[in-house]
C-alpha cells in the first residue's frame, strides 16, 4: 500500500492556491524566516492596533513561553462577522441542518451579526465581561456558534463541554475554569433521540460549591419540560427579547485567551488547553483556506461537534474568518438512513467535506449502495481528521465517495496545536493512502528516538515539533508547570506530540498513533487513567488497567483488565454493570468495549503496571511481549493470554 502514489490531478491544480513548486517555496521561506513569513500572513485578519513584534517564543526548559503578535489588539467576532458585512452581508454564513432532515436554516452574515450581538448583550446583562469564563454545554444548533462568538465579542473566554459528557465530567470542567455562567439547551437531539442537557447541568451544579454558578441560560431546542430554578435559570428567547442587537466588539490583546478546551491527559485529570486570540485566528483561517483550497463561494462542511477542537477551528472560527459558508450538522451519519451525509451534500451542494475515519469506516460497512444512490457531484475536496486513516478506508473514501475525482486531505493535528500541522494541499501534494504527507507552512516536525536523538531521513520514532507556530496552545489553564511537564520535558527544547510516526524516503509522515497512555476512540482522545479511576471507584473492583486495541469501526476500542476484590465473581452481569458505571461516570464515549477479569496485572518489582504487555495481549499478539523476567509475577501473563477477550 505504501508504494501507491496518486498524483495531483490537473483539475485539482486548476485554480488552486498553491502547486508543488509554490508549496516548496512558501514552506522554505516559512521555516527560514518565521518572523518575516508570519508578519506577512498575520495581516490576513483585521487588527485594531497593528502588531510590531511577531514571534516571541521559547521551548527552553523552565522558560517555556509562547507569544505571537503580542503588542497587537483585535477581536475574533469582528474578524468573523463585522468585517464581512459591507461586502457579503447577505451571503449565508451558516447553513444549519437539523437532526430531522426536514429542518434547515440559512443564517446570513447580517443575521449572524444581530444574533451574536443579542447573545452578547444577554451575557453582559448577567455580568459577563473581559476575562470571565462561560461554560457551554450545547447541542449542534446555531445558538452554540452565537454563544462562542458572543463570548469572543466581549473578550470573555468560552469553555465548551461536549454534550455527550456526564454530569460529573461537566461539573469538574465548570469547577476547573470557575464559570459563573452556563449556557445550555432544554434537550439535544441526536439520531432521533433526546439528550437531557438541562437535567445534566442541574446534576452537575449540585456537585459544585453553591455560590459558583450564578446563571444558567437555556435555549429551547425541543420545547421539552425542564426544571427551571427561579433567580438562576432563564430561557434564552425571553432574555433576548429584553436586549438590542447592537453590541460593540471589545479590543483585546493578541494573547488574550479566546477559549479553554479540556482534553484527556494520561494522568487522569483533564487538562484545560488555553488558546489565545491573534495567533490562533491567523492560523485557523490560513489552514482553512490552504488545506481545503477554500475558494470564494464554496460551501464547506465539517461534520465535527463544536465540543471538540475541530468544531472550534473548522466549523466556526477558520471558515467565518474567511467569509465562508459553513455547514453545521445536528445529526449523525446513520439517521434516518446511512445515506444521510451524502443526501446533505446534495441538498446543500457541498464542495468541501471534512469528517473522521471512524465515520468513514462505519459507513463503509454498509457498502456502496447508500453512497451511490446520491450524486455528490458538487464535492471537490474530501478531508479526514481525528486519527490516522487506514489505507482501506482512505481508498473507499477516494474511490466510492469521491468517485476518484476529489482530492483527499488526511490532516494530522491536535487540540493543543489549534490547527492542522501535517497535511496534503489539494493542488500541490501527490497522495499516498494512509499518509498525512507533509508539514504545513511554519511547522518543523522532528523525529526523535527514545533517547531524544534527532533522526534524519526515512525512520520511525517519536514525533516532535522543533519550533512554535501561531496556533499553538499557550498553557494549561491555571497550571503552567503541567504544560511544561506534559509537552516539553520528555524531549527538552521540543514540543512532544505524544504520537509516534514514520517518515518515508519522500519525507512523507505516517502517523502510527499514541505512544503515551491516551487512546483514540472514534477520533476522540480518552485518557486511560480517567477510565481506570472510574472502574476502580466501583465497590467490587480492586484494580483496573485500560489500553486501546484495534477496532474496525472506532479505530481504537477500550480494553479493560479488571481485578476484583476477594470473594467477587466476574461474570457477564458484572461486565454490563461496569460498562453502565463508566458510561454514567464519564459518558458513553468512555464505555469499555471488552472487559477481562484478571486475578492480577503484570507489574514490575517496583509496582508499575506493564502496559506494553497489556497492549500486546489486547491486540492478540504475543509474538513480541519482550522481556517479562523483570515482572514481579511472570505467571500473571500466562493467565491473561489464556483468558483474553480478543481472540483473532
UniProtKB/Swiss-Prot annotation:
What the entry lists under InterPro entries is as follows: Ac_CoA_lig (IPR011904), ACAS_N (IPR032387), AMP-bd_C (IPR025110), AMP-bd_C_sf (IPR045851), AMP-binding_CS (IPR020845), AMP-dep_synth/lig_dom (IPR000873), ANL_N_sf (IPR042099)
The record's section on Pfam families has: ACAS_N, AMP-binding, AMP-binding_C
The molecular function terms in GO held by this entry are: acetate-CoA ligase activity; AMP binding; ATP binding; metal ion binding
Q: Write down the superkingdom of origin.
A: Bacteria
Provide the residue positions that the database annotates as binding ATP: 386-388, 410-415, 499, 514, 525
In its keyword annotation, does this UniProt entry include Ligase?
Answer: yes
Question: Which EC number applies?
Answer: 6.2.1.1
Cofactors (names): Mg(2+)
Q: Where does CoA bind?
A: 190-193, 310, 522, 583
GO terms (BP aspect): acetyl-CoA biosynthetic process from acetate
Q: Which residues bind Mg(2+)?
A: 536, 538, 541
How does it get modified post-translation? Acetylated. Deacetylation by the SIR2-homolog deacetylase activates the enzyme.
One cellular-component annotation, GO: cytosol
In this UniProt entry, the residues modified to N6-acetyllysine are: 608
Reaction catalyzed: acetate + ATP + CoA = acetyl-CoA + AMP + diphosphate
Which keywords accompany this UniProt record? Acetylation, ATP-binding, Ligase, Magnesium, Metal-binding, Nucleotide-binding
Signal peptide extent: none
Q: Which family does it belong to?
A: Belongs to the ATP-dependent AMP-binding enzyme family.
Job of this protein:
Catalyzes the conversion of acetate into acetyl-CoA (AcCoA), an essential intermediate at the junction of anabolic and catabolic pathways. AcsA undergoes a two-step reaction. In the first half reaction, AcsA combines acetate with ATP to form acetyl-adenylate (AcAMP) intermediate. In the second half reaction, it can then transfer the acetyl group from AcAMP to the sulfhydryl group of CoA, forming the product AcCoA.
Entry protein name: Acetyl-coenzyme A synthetase
Amino acid at each position: 500500500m505504501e508504494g501507491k502514489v496518486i498524483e495531483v490531478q490537473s483539475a485539482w491544480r486548476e485554480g488552486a492556491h498553491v502547486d508543488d513548486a509554490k508549496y516548496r517555496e512558501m514552506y522554505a521561506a516559512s521555516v527560514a524566516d518565521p518572523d518575516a513569513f508570519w508578519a506577512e500572513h498575520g495581516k490576513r485578519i483585521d487588527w485594531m492596533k497593528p502588531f510590531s513584534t511577531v514571534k516571541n517564543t521559547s521551548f527552553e526548559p523552565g522558560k517555556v513561553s509562547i507569544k505571537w503578535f503580542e503588542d497587537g489588539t483585535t477581536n475574533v467576532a469582528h474578524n468573523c462577522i463585522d468585517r464581512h458585512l459591507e461586502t457579503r452581508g447577505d451571503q449565508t454564513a451558516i447553513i444549519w441542518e437539523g437532526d430531522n432532515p426536514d429542518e434547515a436554516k440559512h443564517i446570513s452574515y447580517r443575521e449572524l451579526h444581530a444574533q451574536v450581538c443579542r447573545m452578547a448583550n444577554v451575557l453582559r446583562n448577567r455580568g459577563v465581561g473581559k476575562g470571565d469564563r462561560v461554560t457551554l454545554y450545547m447541542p449542534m444548533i446555531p445558538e452554540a456558534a452565537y454563544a462562542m462568538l458572543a463570548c469572543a465579542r466581549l473578550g470573555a473566554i468560552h469553555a465548551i463541554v461536549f454534550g455527550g459528557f456526564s454530569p460529573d465530567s461537566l461539573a469538574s470542567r465548570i469547577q476547573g475554569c470557575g464559570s459563573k455562567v452556563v449556557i445550555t439547551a432544554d434537550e439535544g437531539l441526536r439520531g432521533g433521540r433526546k439528550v437531557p442537557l438541562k437535567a445534566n447541568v442541574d446534576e452537575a451544579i449540585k456537585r459544585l460549591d453553591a455560590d459558583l454558578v450564578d446563571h444558567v441560560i437555556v435555549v429551547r431546542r425541543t420545547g421539552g419540560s425542564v426544571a427551571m430554578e427561579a433567580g438562576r435559570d432563564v430561557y434564552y428567547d425571553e432574555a433576548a427579547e429584553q436586549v438590542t442587537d447592537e453590541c460593540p466588539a471589545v479590543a483585546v490583546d493578541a494573547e488574550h485567551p479566546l477559549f479553554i478546551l479540556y482534553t484527556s491527559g494520561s494522568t487522569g485529570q483533564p487538562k484545560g488547553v488555553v488558546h489565545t486570540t491573534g495567533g490562533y485566528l491567523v492560523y485557523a483561517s490560513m489552514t482553512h483556506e490552504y488545506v481545503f483550497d477554500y475558494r470564494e463561494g464554496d460551501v464547506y462542511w465539517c461534520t465535527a461537534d463544536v465540543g471538540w477542537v475541530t468544531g472550534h477551528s473548522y466549523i466556526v472560527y477558520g471558515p467565518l474568518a474567511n467569509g465562508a459558508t459553513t455547514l453545521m450538522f445536528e445529526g449523525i451519519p446513520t439517521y434516518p438512513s446511512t445515506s444521510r451525509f451524502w443526501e446533505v451534500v446534495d441538498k446543500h451542494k457541498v464542495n468541501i467535506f471534512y469528517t473522521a475515519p471512524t465515520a468513514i469506516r462505519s459507513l463503509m460497512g454498509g457498502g456502496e449502495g447508500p453512497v451511490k444512490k446520491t450524486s455528490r457531484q458538487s464535492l471537490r475536496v474530501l478531508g479526514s481528521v481525528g486519527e490516522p486513516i487506514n489505507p482501506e478506508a482512505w481508498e473507499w473514501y477516494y474511490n466510492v465517495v469521491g468517485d476518484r475525482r476529489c482530492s483527499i486531505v488526511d490532516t494530522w493535528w491536535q487540540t493543543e496545536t489549534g490547527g492542522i500541522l501535517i497535511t496534503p494541499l489539494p493542488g500541490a501534494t501527490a497522495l499516498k493512502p494512509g499518509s498525512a504527507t507533509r508539514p504545513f507552512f511554519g511547522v518543523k516536525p522532528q523525529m526523535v528516538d527514545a533517547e531524544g536523538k534527532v533522526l534524519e531521513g526515512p525512520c520511525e520514532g517519536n514525533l516532535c515539533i522543533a519550533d512554535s507556530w501561531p496556533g499553538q496552545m499557550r498553557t494549561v489553564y491555571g497550571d503552567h508547570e503541567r504544560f511544561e511537564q506534559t509537552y516539553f520535558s520528555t524531549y527538552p527544547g521540543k514540543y512532544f506530540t505524544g504520537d509516534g510516526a514514520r517518515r518515508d524516503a519522500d519525507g512523507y509522515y505516517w502517523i502510527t498513533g499514541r505512544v503515551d497512555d491516551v487512546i483514540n476512540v472514534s477520533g476522540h482522545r480518552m485518557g486511560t487513567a480517567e477510565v481506570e479511576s472510574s472502574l476502580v471507584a466501583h465497590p467490587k473492583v480492586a484494580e483496573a488497567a485500560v489500553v486501546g486495541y484495534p477496532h474496525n469501526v472506532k479505530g481504537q476500542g477500550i480494553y479493560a483488565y479488571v481485578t476484583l476484590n476477594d470473594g467477587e465473581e466476574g461474570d457477564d452481569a458484572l461486565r454490563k454493570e461496569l460498562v453502565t458505571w463508566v458510561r454514567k461516570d464519564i459518558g458513553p464515549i468512555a464505555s469499555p468495549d471488552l472487559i477481562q477479569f484478571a486475578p492480577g496485572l503484570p507489574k514490575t518489582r517496583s509496582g508499575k503496571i506493564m502496559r506494553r504487555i497489556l497492549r500486546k495481549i489486547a491486540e492478540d499478539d504475543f509474538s513480541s511481549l519482550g522481556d517479562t523476567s523483570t515482572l514481579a509475577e511472570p505467571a500473571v501473563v500466562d493467565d491473561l493470554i489464556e483468558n483474553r477477550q480478543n481472540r483473532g
